[in-house]
Regions:
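Beta-strand-rich recognition/accessory modules
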Residues: 1-19, 29, 39, 106-111, ...
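Hydrophobic residues positioned within well-ordered beta-strands of beta-sheet architectures
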Residues: 14, 24, 101-103, 124-126, ...
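Acidic-aromatic substrate-binding/catalytic surfaces of carbohydrate-active enzymes
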Residues: 22-78, 252
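Beta-strand elements of well-folded, non-transmembrane domains
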Residues: 107-109, 128-132, 143-145, 157-161, ...
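Active-site/ligand-binding surface loops and adjacent short beta/alpha elements
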Residues: 148-150, 154-228
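Extended, loop-rich substrate-binding clefts of extracytoplasmic carbohydrate-active enzymes
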Residues: 4, 8, 77-131
Length: 278
C-alpha cells in the first residue's frame, strides 16, 4: 500500500494505491474523491472537463460530500460547506489487500463565514477503502457540542458510464420516488433507462445495480435513508457552465442520502456507509 501527496489540477491531493494496483485520488478540498481506478486501470468516476480545480468552487464530478444540508433543504449554503472546505489527512494504511485514507473536518477548519452561519461544534470523519474491485466510503458525523444540531448528508457519486443510452439501473422496481417536479410515484418497471432528465429521490435503501455497456456496479448503503438518482439531460446540461454540453451522456449520479434535516444529540454520532463493487 502506497500513499503519496500529489496535485489534481491545482488542488493538493492524496493518492493511494492498493496491493493489486487499484488507485484512488482524494483532494483535501472537500475530501473529494476525484479518481478511482480499479486494478485493470479503468477509471470508474466521472469528472467534468470544465469544472474548476483551484479550491474556491465546488467540483463537478467524483464524489462531492454533502453536509450539513442537502440542496436547499435547510437554511444554509446549498449542499452545505463540507464540499468547499479544506479537510485534513488523519490516517492511512491497509492490510489483507486493502488500502485506505481517512480525512477529518471540524468547526476549527471552516472559513469564518461558514462557521458563523452554522455555529455548531462537530467533527466529520470520512474514510475511503479499496479492496479488490470494491470501494467503500464510511462517513461519521459527531456532535462534539453541548446542544443538538440538525443535519442532512449525502455522497453525490458521479459514475463514468461511457454511453448514457446504454445505461440502466435495476433494484428500484416497486419503490416510491419524488421527481424534480415534486410528483410522487411508484416505479412499476424493472429497470430505469436514461433518455431524458432524471432527478429522483427514492424512499429506498435497497441494493442497486448500475449496468453500463461494459460494467455492472453493485451499490449498497447503510445508515442513509434514500437513494438519489440524477442526470441533467441535454437541456439542463447546456445551462451548466462547469459541464461541457455533451458530457451529460457520460455519467449518472447515484447517491446514498439522508436529505431531510434530522437532529443529532449532544455527544452522539451518526455513521453512514456506502459500498461500490464491480
Amino acid at each position: 500500500m502506497a500513499v503519496t501527496m500529489t496535485q489534481f489540477g491545482a488542488l493538493p491531493a492524496v493518492q493511494f494505491t492498493a496491493p493489486d494496483g487499484a488507485q484512488a485520488t482524494v483532494a483535501l478540498f472537500g475530501a473529494h474523491l476525484l479518481s478511482w481506478k480499479t486494478a485493470d486501470g479503468v477509471e470508474r468516476l466521472f469528472v467534468s472537463s470544465q469544472t474548476p480545480l483551484y479550491g474556491s468552487k465546488a467540483i463537478r464530478g467524483g464524489v462531492p460530500v454533502i453536509f450539513p444540508q442537502f440542496n436547499v433543504r435547510g437554511p444554509g449554503l446549498r449542499h452545505g460547506f463540507a464540499r468547499v472546505s479544506t479537510w485534513r489527512l488523519a490516517d492511512s494504511g491497509g492490510d489483507n489487500g486493502s488500502a485506505f485514507v481517512e480525512l477529518v473536518l471540524d468547526q476549527s477548519d471552516l472559513a469564518p463565514e461558514h462557521a458563523q452561519a452554522w455555529p455548531h461544534q462537530f467533527a466529520l470523519t470520512l474514510r475511503f477503502t479499496m479492496h479488490g474491485n470494491a470501494l467503500e466510503a464510511g462517513f461519521t458525523v459527531r456532535n462534539t457540542g453541548a446542544a443538538p444540531f440538525p443535519f442532512g448528508v449525502a455522497l453525490h457519486t458521479y459514475y463514468d458510464v461511457g454511453q448514457l443510452n446504454a445505461t440502466t439501473i435495476s433494484g428500484l422496481q416497486h419503490q416510491q420516488y419524488t421527481d424534480h417536479e415534486l410528483n410522487t410515484r411508484i416505479q412499476d418497471y424493472p429497470a430505469l433507462h436514461f433518455n431524458e432528465k432524471h432527478d429522483r429521490l427514492y424512499q429506498s435503501t435497497s441494493t442497486l445495480m448500475l449496468n453500463t455497456a461494459s460494467t455492472t456496479f453493485n451499490l449498497s448503503q447503510q445508515g442513509f435513508t434514500e437513494w438519489v438518482v440524477w442526470n441533467p439531460g441535454q437541456v439542463d446540461a447546456a445551462a451548466l457552465v462547469d459541464l461541457a454540453d455533451d458530457e451529460y451522456q457520460r455519467f449518472v449520479c447515484i447517491e446514498p442520502a439522508r436529505v431531510d434535516q434530522q437532529p443529532l444529540a449532544a455527544g452522539a454520532q451518526w455513521t453512514g456507509r456506502h459500498r461500490i463493487g464491480i
